[in-house]
A protein has these predicted regions:
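Acidic/proline-rich low-complexity IDRs
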Residues: 1-2, 11
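Residue-level recognition of the N-termini of beta-strands and the immediately preceding loop/turn
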Residues: 2, 24-28, 108
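Right-handed parallel beta-helix/beta-spiral solenoid domain characteristic of secreted/periplasmic
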Residues: 5-9, 45-107
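N-terminal extracellular ligand-recognition/capping segment immediately after the signal peptide
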Residues: 7-17, 23-47, 52-58
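Generic, low-specificity signal for short hydrophobic/alpha-helical stretches with a mild N-terminal bias
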Residues: 12, 21, 30, 73, ...
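Active-site-proximal loop/turn and secondary-structure-junction residues that shape catalytic pockets
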Residues: 34, 64, 139
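Generic, ordered loop/turn and secondary-structure boundary motif
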Residues: 35-36, 59, 113, 134
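Right-handed parallel beta-helix
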Residues: 82-162
């Protein structure tokens, strides 16, 4: 397993983009601090972990109602602070936040968008003003251990039935 240490001020996306394209498990350990950037993880078997959700935060600020240079709205599915589009990935001991507010002006603002089988979210905090977590299609093996989903309750997820 490959272990990579990242500190505040370093670009997490640059580290992810430089990962080997093999199938070896990788853990990216984030030192305590704030990582202000939009992240896309498309490499399988990759874990992003912090020391605790209280001290390690990944944050960005895209809202669905934002007008892009082409004159169109951003839309919900392009607002995620962290996109995980790979299988067997994990997120541990991290806060992922979409800081776009207020809801009435920005619309939906995903913190975490997961499209991959076997995703594990452990001891994390997810924050946004609306639609904090989005999984699509519903993965058959979604794992949420001791994770906070958002400011309101939600219905249980049933793969292939929603």
């Amino acid at each position: 397993m490959l272990l990579i240490q990242v500190a505040p001020g370093q670009s997490l996306q640059t580290v992810i983009d430089a990962l080997p394209a093999d199938n070896q498990p990788v853990t990216i350990h984030l030192a305590p601090g704030v990582y202000e950037e939009k992240i896309a993880l498309r490499r399988p078997r990759t874990c992003i972990e912090g020391e605790s959700a209280e001290t390690t935060r990944v944050t960005w600020h895209d809202g669905a109602a934002e007008i892009l240079p082409d004159g169109k709205k951003r839309g919900t599915f392009r607002t995620a602070t962290l996109l995980v589009n790979a299988r067997d990935c994990a997120l541990r001991n991290v806060t992922v936040e979409n800081s776009a507010y207020p809801r009435e002006q920005v619309g939906q603002a995903l913190a975490l968008y997961v499209d991959g089988d076997g995703f594990c979210c452990e001891d994390c905090t997810l924050k946004s003003c609306q639609d904090t977590l989005f999984t699509a299609p519903l993965p058959p093996r979604e794992i949420q251990k001791d994770g906070f989903i958002g400011p309101t309750q939600f219905l249980p997820r049933i793969p292939q039935r929603q």
